[in-house]
């Protein structure tokens, strides 16, 4: 790393004022601060000194996503070999999944970072780090058969209209990755739902077997269409079920959650409240809900199926788009969990529910914080008046 530091110091004058690459200073600054903590000194103002900056925080989130991503790659291969009947061992399945998922990661980063580079150059600012996380989240929350060109269009839409128009990193109202999924869901519904998108039917570089018209339903999709409550299986916990690339394994997601909670990056209040809200609403529907598979599904199945765990750990805890007051985090998380189950039960056309629940609560997060703050002010005023009397 010292050699790299010396090399960057050597070429840095070329990117400063008067240098021959001055036009690309924002690109150089973004790359430099990604690798090393900035050594710039503030001229005025009060600042908090810490050994970690936002890029380091984003890097920790990406590390927390790695277990779910790696398992997702394996599961993509496992589901393909299992559905097509092709012969293959662990490494064949993992390599197949790796080759299927890698292009989506590349497209996500190339399109998203490309737009951020252009915006940074236009605004003459340093490249912002927020897409470091969004770029890996996007391919993890889509089906494996999502076409690359559609993913590119959706990524561009979300970066421009859900992030840059609001001012960039830290200013967005909605979770960028979920806006990508929402755009895909409403603009290209056949590529995001049904039984033909969750398992790849193609052979990749000789691995696997090509099968036309391969259809495999997710447990939630089967419950919404078959009229039967899916029987609980440990595959629902380990993640060996059809679904979006990175959302199926509760164990892998839990490993990421432990890291986020241990480092203090994610709020346990928000995360815990999402599960409480989901379990409570599932229990309510079990008790008084309609006689449908979604309404009668046990609360623990609701929590481990679909994107519930992934959304609770990596989406609801987004510090930019979630509630920021301590009490507000409980309310915000609880309402997300409850709303996700309500959408699942009452809207057969959307058996997932988590995406819409989080985006809806992103809208209400500022209002929740406002009500909490005003409530605290009101209580303190009453205590002050009472003590003066």
Give a label for each model feature.
Residues 111-116, 131-140, 155-162, 252-260, ...:
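Hydrophobic, membrane-inserted alpha-helices
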Residues 94-108, 145-154, 236-250, 295-308:
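Structural signature of hydrophobic alpha-helical transmembrane segments
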Residues 1-105, 389:
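N-terminal signal-anchor module of multipass membrane proteins
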Residues 42-48, 112-123, 160-170, 255-263, ...:
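C-terminal ends of transmembrane helices
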């Amino acid at each position: 790393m010292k050699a790299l530091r010396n090399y960057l110091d050597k070429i840095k004058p070329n990117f400063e004022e008067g240098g021959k690459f001055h036009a690309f200073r924002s690109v150089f600054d973004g790359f430099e601060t990604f690798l090393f903590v900035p050594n710039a000194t503030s001229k005025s103002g009060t600042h908090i000194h810490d050994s970690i900056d936002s890029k380091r925080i984003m890097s920790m989130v990406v590390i927390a996503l790695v277990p779910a991503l790696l398992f997702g790659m394996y599961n993509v291969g496992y589901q393909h070999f299992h559905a097509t009947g092709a012969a293959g061992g662990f490494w064949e399945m993992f390599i197949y999944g790796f080759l299927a998922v890698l292009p989506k990661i590349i497209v996500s980063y190339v399109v998203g970072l490309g737009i951020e580079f252009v915006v940074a150059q236009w605004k003459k600012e340093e490249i912002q780090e927020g897409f470091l996380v969004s770029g890996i989240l996007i391919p993890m929350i889509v089906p494996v058969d999502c076409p690359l060109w559609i993913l590119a269009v959706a990524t561009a839409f979300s970066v421009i209209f859900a992030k840059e128009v609001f001012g960039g990193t830290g200013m967005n109202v909605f979770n960028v990755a979920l806006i990508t999924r929402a755009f895909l869901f409403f603009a290209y519904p056949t590529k995001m739902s049904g039984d033909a998108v969750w398992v790849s039917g193609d052979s990749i570089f000789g691995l696997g077997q090509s099968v036309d018209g391969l259809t495999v339903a997710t447990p939630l999709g089967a419950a919404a269409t078959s009229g039967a409550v899916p029987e609980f299986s440990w595959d629902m916990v380990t993640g060996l079920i059809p679904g979006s690339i990175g959302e199926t394994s509760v164990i892998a997601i839990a490993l990421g959650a432990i890291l986020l909670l241990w480092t203090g990056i994610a709020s346990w209040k928000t995360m815990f409240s999402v599960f409480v809200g989901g379990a409570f609403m599932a229990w309510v529907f079990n008790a008084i809900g309609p006689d449908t598979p979604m309404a009668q599904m046990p609360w623990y199945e609701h929590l481990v199926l679909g994107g519930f765990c992934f959304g609770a750990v990596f989406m609801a805890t987004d510090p930019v788009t979630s509630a920021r007051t301590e009490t507000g985090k409980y309310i915000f998380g609880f309402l997300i969990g409850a709303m996700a189950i309500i959408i699942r039960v009452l809207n057969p056309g959307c058996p997932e529910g988590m995406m819409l629940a989080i985006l809806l609560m992103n809208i209400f997060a500022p209002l929740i914080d406002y009500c909490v703050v005003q409530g605290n002010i009101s209580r303190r005023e009453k205590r002050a008046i009472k003590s003066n009397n």
